[in-house]
UniProtKB/Swiss-Prot annotation:
Catalytic activity field: (6S)-5,6,7,8-tetrahydrofolate + formate + ATP = (6R)-10-formyltetrahydrofolate + ADP + phosphate
Entry keyword annotation includes Ligase: yes
Name of the protein in its database record: Formate--tetrahydrofolate ligase
Gene transcribed to yield this protein: fhs
Any one GO molecular-function label of the UniProt entry: ATP binding
Length: 557
């Protein structure tokens, strides 16, 4: 069987200028980065402001399993199928992080016949956006320590420096480090923790900013430390905002690429959904909505993580309102949620499908809690049987049902998602969405967390550690109680325990810590043992990546 990379390389891509023209982007507004990728000029984007928005389709998954769900693949297949059906459609996705590419998950450009391309360029350096974000983040960290070194005019308390350095790599050795060792010329020694770039506040700001002015306002609001009197220190105090914005200026223009079938795709920004808010940039999404009648976008992991954050954070801040949600699952993954071992997934097991469907039903219910009509997309495998598909239909009918479409876009491209595209078109036309965020702005922070835990995760309650309770109370006293909350939690379960698959009941969600992201405009609550700097697995994917004698990359997936 051909690999995703082989399929991508065998496809004939169109010059990026042709893709731009098909999307309604004039040649003078395209900034080419080679033959097959480019950026969209910010001035052109501003000129679109008065155009009406198209319909927004949000794609989410179930709780992920090692069997894979294919959410990005489905987003791409749906976009291609909508285009094939005659709709003026675009796709808006996140950029991949190097950490997962070299770690366990692999890249994030889809799979099979449903990919965005050029695959290896997008998965690796792409247009340099993540380098710019990492550089801006670490410039701020350097200027902060430099200020303390040169006399500390602002009276920063070194014990209350909160801002972290970042790197776009899975590197557990950087979770807890000590800076400034050696003589005094290296600065004062202090503890420092690193985040992966996609979990940093600068990444979140990049993805939530509406334009360069908004970007600078948000950067200026980051709380990097506290003075000895407890007052906050910001990049504005350190005179760092201008230089950070200069590093981010070009990166803030969204990236244009194409699917293997030539559908225009804006791929821009990439916060993780388990340890950050998990959505592509507001600028890319809004640009696509001005250019297309239907925009397909995704949120990371399940409805409980990226889905909830897309709707409670991104939509709240950007004024977006999806027309419907698509929840992606596989029959194989549902079997795993019922306890079937990965080695046994190929054997027919309708009973396991019915039991595992409880996880899917909870994700469907989560999207309905926001007033969205839901379509279920089953990403098909050759091992799926008719009996298993019927068992799934029956299981979904238990809760009033959801429209279900069985898809084969991995193997067949747009032709394999025709039914899904038609379901989306009909759902948009019905105008049945009644979108509303899950909680009001004026709800207290612990109550916002409790609302998410009970209505989305199915928990009985939350349990705040003394540290988390203290920090949430402090944030409220400082005037941040109006902000939405961003829960950092394992993606593998509705609980904080990654081993509890399916749809658990009778549990509480432990909140061990909280962080303020004043620039991004939310409060991060850390549930369980989730970490904001991942590590590599025992056998990282990087071991299989290399170059052939002609210099072509192999081993990416």
């Amino acid at each position: 069987m051909a690999s995703d990379l082989d399929i991508a390389r065998a496809s004939r891509l169109r010059p990026i200028g042709e893709i731009a023209a098909a999307a309604g982007i004039p040649a003078e507004a395209l900034i080419p980065y080679g033959r097959y990728k480019g950026k969209v000029d910010g001035g052109f984007i501003r000129s679109l402001e008065d155009r009406p928005d198209g319909a927004l389709v949000l794609v989410v998954g179930i709780s992920p399993t090692p069997a894979g769900e294919g959410k990005t693949t489905t987003s791409i297949g749906l976009g291609d199928a909508l285009r094939a059906a005659g709709a003026k459609a675009m796709i808006a996705l996140r950029e991949p992080s190097l950490g997962p590419c070299f770690g366990q998950k692999g890249g994030a450009t889809g799979g099979g016949r449903a990919q965005v391309a050029p695959m290896e360029e997008i998965n690796l350096h792409f247009t340099g956006d993540f380098h710019a974000i990492t550089s801006a983040n670490n410039l701020l960290a350097a200027m902060l320590d430099n200020h303390v070194y040169w006399g500390n005019e602002l009276g920063i308390d070194p014990r209350r420096i909160a801002f972290r350095r970042a790197i776009d790599m899975n590197d557990r050795a950087l979770r807890q480090t000590v800076l400034g060792l050696g003589d005094g010329a290296n600065g004062a020694a202090r503890e420092q923790k690193f985040d992966i770039t996609v979990a940093s506040e600068v990444m979140a700001i990049f993805c939530l900013a509406r334009d360069l002015d908004d970007l600078q306002r948000r950067l200026a609001r980051i709380v990097v430390a506290e003075r000895r009197d407890g007052s906050p220190v910001t990049p504005a105090d350190l005179k760092a905002v201008g230089a950070m914005a200069a590093l981010l200026r070009d990166a803030l223009q969204p990236n244009l690429v194409q699917t293997l079938e030539g559908t225009p795709a804006l791929v821009h920004g990439g916060p993780f959904a388990n340890i950050a808010h998990g959505c592509n940039s507001v600028i890319a999404t809004r640009t696509a909505l001005k250019l297309a009648d239907i925009v397909v976008t995704e949120a990371g992991f399940g409805a409980d993580l990226g889905g909830e954050k897309f709707l409670d954070i991104k939509c709240r801040q950007a004024g977006l309102a999806p027309s419907c949600a698509v929840v992606v699952a596989t029959i194989r993954a549902l079997k795993m949620h019922a306890g079937v071992a990965k080695a046994d997934l190929g054997a027919e097991n309708p009973g396991a499908v019915a039991r595992g469907a409880a996880n899917l039903r909870r994700h469907v219910a989560a999207m309905r809690a926001f007033g969205l009509p839901v379509i279920v997309a089953i990403n098909g495998f050759v091992t799926d049987t008719g009996a298993e598909r019927e068992a799934l239909r029956a299981a979904l009918d238990e809760d009033g049902g959801a429209r279900i479409c069985f898809c084969t876009h991995w193997a067949d491209g747009s032709a394999g998602a025709t039914d899904l595209a038609q379901a989306v078109i009909e759902t948009i036309a019905a105008k049945s969405a009644r979108f509303a965020p899950l909680y009001p702005d004026d709800m207290k922070l612990p109550h916002k967390l409790r609302t998410i835990a009970q209505r989305i995760y199915g928990a009985d309650d939350i349990e705040l550690s003394p540290l988390a309770a203290k920090r949430l109370a402090r944030f409220e006293a400082q005037g941040y109680d109006h902000l939405p909350v961003c829960v950092a939690k394992t993606q593998y379960s509705f609980t904080a325990d990654p081993a509890r698959r399916g749809a658990p009941t009778g549990f509480t969600v432990p909140i061990r810590d909280a962080r303020l992201s004043a620039g991004a405009g939310f409060v991060v609550a850390l549930a369980g043992d989730v970490m904001t700097m991942p590590g590599l697995p025992r056998i990282p994917a990087a071991e299989a990546i290399g170059l052939d004698p002609d210099g072509a990359i192999h081993g990416l997936f």
